[in-house]
Every structure is written in C-alpha cells, then in structure tokens.
C-alpha cells in the first residue's frame, strides 16, 4: 500500500507522522526500549503535542532481533497470533557509545541513535551494515475519510540488493519493483493473487525479515521508494524480526527455528503421483485404467490421488464415497496397496447443506456464524455450504474423527484443498478477529489435518 504522492507529498486523504528524533533509551529485562518523537525537541515546549513512537528491541534466539513499534500502546491486539518458538533466556549485550546504543544478539546487532539525535536503527553483522531505518521510515498514517490507522516501516535496500520470498508466488522470482499483498485467495496460478502468502522475505545481502502479523500486510519492494522495502498494516502496532545469515540456508534455518519446521516426510511421498485432477466423471474402472496404463508404459507410480468426485455430487465434503461410482472403496484401496501404491483423497473444510453432515455440524455449533447468530452459508462451491470453525477445539476433534474413518479404510494422506476464501464478516467461537483469521484459517485447517 502506497502512502506517498511522489517523493515529497503524502498521499491525498491521509495524514502522517514519522519518528524523527530519539528522545530516550532505557534498558529492560530482555532488551531496550526507546522513544522517538515526531517533533524535533530542542526544549520542553517542543514536547507539547505530536506523536511519540515506542520501539522495543529484544531477541528470541541468537542472530535474530525482534522489533516492536507502537503508536497508541493501549490499542487492542486481538487474536490470532502466530505461535513462535521464543528462547526467554537468549543472550544479548547492550553497549552505549558516543553516537548510538548497540543491542547485540550474537552475530546480529542493531545500533539505535542516541537521545537528541535524528532517529535511526542500523542492523549490522560481521562489521557490515545489512539494512536499517531512519527519519520518515517509521510512520503512523490515518485515512481521513474512514479514520483507519496504519503503521508503516521502511528498511533500506542497497543498490544491487535483490529481494526474494513472500510465500507461494507466480510472478517474477526477484521481487524488486513489486507490490506484494499478504492475502490468501482461491487464485489460480497466473496472477499476483496467491494461495499461501507468507510475510517473510530475504535478500542477497545475507539477512531476512519476518513481519509477525497474520492479517493483511502490504509490502512495497522498492516500488514506493526505490531504495526501501516498505511494509504496513492497519492498527497502531508493527512487529517484525530481522534475521541474520549470512548464507540463505542460515537465514532459513533461523527463520524456521523461530516459526517451526515441517516434520520429515515419508520417502514414498517423493515419488510420482497420478491424479484424476478435475475429471468429473470417473469410477473404479477409470482409475484402474489409469493405474494399469502407467504400469504398461513402465512409469513407476508412488501415489494415486482421488480428486473431488470421489464424493457424491452436492455432498462436498462429507467424507463419504459415492457408492454409485465406487462399489468397494476399502477393497480398491487394498488393491492399490498390493500394487505398491499409496492412496490420497481430496478434502476441504466446507460442508454442503444437502449433506446430513451439515446438520450434524450445525447442531453442534461447529460452523462459522454471522453476527446475528445465523450459520454463514454461501453457494460459492456447494449449495448453501457452511465452513468448519477450526477455532473451536471440539470442531477440530470432530473433523479429525471423520478423517480417522478414512485412515482406518486405508487412505494414506489427504489433499487439503480450499480454505483461502474465508469471509471477514463471520464470528469465531474463540472470539478471534475475523480479518486476522482470514489467512490464519488455512493454517488451523492444515494443522488440524
């Protein structure tokens, strides 16, 4: 999201204030806390009016520095939040010099301009500057017509610096010059819309940045200011982590230590998969023809995947095989296993209102609701479909119980489709903010499975 009109002017319809001068720096139990005023304070009278930003620095692990920037500190910060692996005993050092106060977390340090100086933070490793921010980098913006508040930060880019990341993307691999939005959608694969948006990037200068917000984060990668990566989100608080390398594998190792790592996958999952894809009319004979055809051509298979029409039409997704098309699914799966194949079936987190499973889920309160208490329904994919509320532990257990029956039948794995188009006007059982849950929902869905 762009907040400027060219280089000099603020975008029409917005007001802005920027961190301009360091006012004070204090040590805390786990780092330092600095205040940066939007005014140049040369005397006490200059302190009347105008925002003051609170910037807190700490470390969750060696080589990582956490930055929290706040405008109004009393603003609500509702769930959900990503679970991070924080080392409460991570070592750090603080050193005060003539021009800056240095906070050091092992191989990574940040130098904060001392009180009275123009506000700046410079992130360094091995004696080299990696990135940083200065006056007009950290800012608070308000859209005058709506009263919506935004927090924005800009981190410096070198002339030859290349930026990568942001999750699954279908455009150019190098992100410089792009506007990148963190908003999951049922996108296809030929636009800037994506299924898996991840607010993390890394650069060829040996560091990465993770912006710890589950809601929409907007990145301007050298696209609003050519020498900066800008990120912004609604509200009065911005939290991000600068992660040292120096090699890409070092950045990713530290990043995944912070956010969590996927378990090791079974060896068979790396083999060749064959799918019905979106073939809408197939049965046991069709599947047998596919599998036998691969064998006749000496093409080794590892997994056969049944896409959505293993289910009865208008019954997605009630986890019941279409008995008219698949007479003996247990026996067919056993035959696949005898041929050395694993079996995968397609699922999603939506329930057609025609399926009896919808009534079961509705009666137990397992579906997302509207503010008036009605079940949220849409004809988007299936008639009157509802969405499972994965914020409710009982709903997660119930959903898993349906998968367990398929596993007992012999199914080896699941394709967890959909979940990206969750609306923002719904109410969650645990009270989570519906905008922040839009992206987080797919995480809960996949974690449940």
Predicted regions, residues:
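Ligand-site clamp/hinge motif
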Residues: 272
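Append "and occasionally in soluble cytosolic enzymes with long acidic Gly/Pro-rich linkers
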Residues: 293-300
